[in-house]
Amino acid sequence: MSSQSIRLQQIIARGFASVAAGMGSLLVTAALVWGADPVGPAAEGFKTIPPNKTLSTDTKKRLEIEGLVRRIINGAPLTGNETIFDGYYASYLFPQWTQTTEEDLKALPKERDKFIKNSMELAGAKNPTAHSRLLDLSHTKLAEVAQDPAFHPAVRYNAILTVGLLNEAEPNRGTGIKQMPEPYIKALVTLLEELKKPGNNEAVRVGALLGVTRHLEWDNSKPVGSGKRIPPAMRNDAIAELTSIVNAKVPPAGRSMEGQTWLRRRALEALGQAYALKVEPDFAKLLSSIIGDDAEPISLRCTAADVMAHVEYPAAALPPISPMAKELGYLALFACN
């Protein structure tokens, strides 16, 4: 990183710290985050998939099947047990996630976390064959739920969040061997489709945005030329959609101005991941224009300042130091008044 770029980031960091210190209760934290699902009240009239009747009513049989699945996840041979393995997830576990009682909906975040840790991550470490099979199966089945408007919004949101968490290579937690997660590239296709879909459910679109952000974030850890990075065309598609969200100042019908600002901030953060290693001139101009625009919401301007502090500027995209420091000073004063 050049000395100019380092100096700019130091100025931005100090300026943003002043802004953050003075904001207090002015910034509203959105409810739609990874651990706070919009479950809402239980409601009738939504589509559900009945879980396998035998496993739902015969405890002994269910425990037997779950024991076999756990053994496979932990390294036992999958060969000869594919039908049972697939059926447990496709006909029992995932259908449970479509139920709409209040208890079922509230349990979705916990069940999602348990599935990722105890099935996906564990299989990735213990049984690559089972992991690969479950990866494809999970993406297929959960994408179907996320894309179907007949399901409860919370059910669809949970499904698209899980799609966004799927990895081709899982992190090696607690093994002492450093392994960064490699998000499942096929899932990114689904995430972008749901993010771009006109009139899509708001919760599904937010879940897709969070998933796209995660893909862009972890893409930065993949070596250039490794063949594992997001294809350029797909990356450009994501950047174009995210930029359009950031530039959309007027909310569509049914969305509040606060909700629109929140969505713009998340899209701006996602772009920060896309440009974390090298800021392009167009993105540098976008950040500077938001920071210096008094008509923009203060929370969005602060997000732009925060993003600017965490990306690397090459010489061609580096904004003038003095004017930018001045804009950040104005932003700090405005936020603290």
Name each model feature, range by range.
Residues 2-24:
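Bacterial N-terminal signal peptides that target proteins for export
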Residues 22, 161-164, 210:
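Short, flexible loop/turn elements at secondary-structure junctions
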Residues 24-28, 32:
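Hydrophobic core
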Residues 31-107, 146, 150-155, 168-183, ...:
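Long, helix-rich interaction regions
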Residues 93-96, 113-121, 140, 144:
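Acidic/histidine-rich, surface-exposed loop or edge segments in extracytoplasmic proteins
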Residues 106-125, 157-166:
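Non-membrane alpha-helical segments in proteins
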Residues 109-113, 126, 130-140, 181-187:
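Intrinsically disordered, low-complexity segments enriched in glycine and mixed charged residues
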